[in-house]
Each structure stands twice: as structure tokens, then as C-alpha cells.
């Protein structure tokens, strides 16, 4: 079941992220969180996210506007490291509440509450028409990079903010997509450096012992397939129905994470 869930999410969402407001991590991180601790889920998602985005760079990276990439990705990289360090700090904090539900021990930690809040906020953004065309003036691109990078490093959730701030950069569709992909690679490399230095080396045994390495590889391959098919077959997709489904799923996952069920 774990392979089915991870592979299905990675394949479906990877193709759609070329054209949609949400990113691969928005759904893949909660999917990994069903089977692993939050910090391991975030790091595992980052590996799939990075390798998938490198593949996307090969497909569409030549269209990127590197002037915009520099303005957005430099502050994003710095703040991604800050967010990743904060995530590491959260892993050292003692649980707030522990309880038993249906014979299973559920734990509520500050880390889970914070990430659950972010997931619910992104769910509301997906569900509300008010945020459907959310965008910011081009002068705020560095600020957008900083915010997107910070939340990417902390939770893996960054796609919606990246889209909102880059959509007003005056780029054609091809340049817009290429710029987003290259910027995402910069953020992924930055946060993975911190994950590797801090908790991921410590928690890798958790991933390995529970079959997570195979899940990461399978998720990566399925994400490659989804990105390839998406880049070849999809020209323009109306995302509203998909956004509603995504929003509902995120809302349920956010509530489950916040309550300690996940």
C-alpha cells in the first residue's frame, strides 16, 4: 500500500506541477508522513523533489530567465537553510501530548502542530477562489524567494508561494516554468545540505529499516515519468477541480498531523 500511495502521488502530481500552483512537495510530503516521522518525510520528499526538478531542468530549464532566477533563488537558498535548521530544532523538542487511540500511541509535537498549520493554510489557499489568481508585484520577487525558501526548508511546502511571486515577473509561459524549476533546484540543494548535516543522517536508519529507501527510489522514478508525460502532452489544464481535490486532501492530512494521528 505504501508503494501504491507514494508512486501514484509522485506520478500524478509531478506532471501537474509544470502547470499548476501547488508543488510536488505539497502532496508528497503528507504521503510520506503517513509512514515516517515528519522530519524524515520532509527530507525524503526533498530527495524526490530535487531529482525530479533536475530532470525537469533538462526538459525545460533552457527557457529560464536567469536574471529572475538570481533575484528569487539567492534569498530562497539562504532562507531554506534557516527553515531546515528550524526543523532540526523542532525534532529535539519534547512532545506536548501523547494519547492512545484504537490501541495506537499518538503524539502531538510542536513540529507537527507547526507543519499541520502550514498544511491547513495551503489547503485553504487551494480551496478558496480568492487565492486562485494570487500574485504579487515583481518588486517583491526577492521577498517571495525568502518566504518560499523558508517554508520549503521547514516543511517542504513552497510551490504555491513560488508561483504567486513569480507569476508577475513578466515572463512568457515557457520562461515562467523554466524559472520556477531552476529556482526549485537551488532551494532543494540548500535544504538537503542542512538535512544531511543535521537530522537526516541520524534518522536515515528509520527510513532504511522501514523500507523507505525503496519508496524514495520508486517515488523518484514515478515522478520522472509524470514530468516527462506532462511536458509532452499537457498544453493547458484547467486546474480548479484538481485544486479542490488537493485542498480537501491537504485539509484532512493537516488535521491528522496536528492531532497526532500521523
At which residue positions do the language-model features occur?
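Cytoplasmic-side transmembrane-helix entry/capping segments in multi-pass membrane proteins
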Residues: 66-77, 136-145, 178-181, 242-247
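Small-residue-rich segments of transmembrane alpha-helices in multi-pass membrane proteins
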Residues: 35-38, 73-84, 141-154, 187-189, ...
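Membrane-interface alpha-helices at helix entry/exit sites of multi-pass transporters
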Residues: 38-44, 67-71, 170-183
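Structural signature of hydrophobic alpha-helical transmembrane segments
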Residues: 2-3, 32-50, 106-117, 146-156, ...
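Residues within membrane-spanning alpha-helices of integral membrane proteins
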Residues: 3, 46, 116-119, 123, ...
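Selective hydrophobic functional segments
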Residues: 43-102, 189-237
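Transmembrane helix exit motif
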Residues: 53-59, 84-96, 112-137, 228, ...
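Selected transmembrane alpha-helices and immediately adjacent juxtamembrane segments
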Residues: 1-36, 126-180, 217
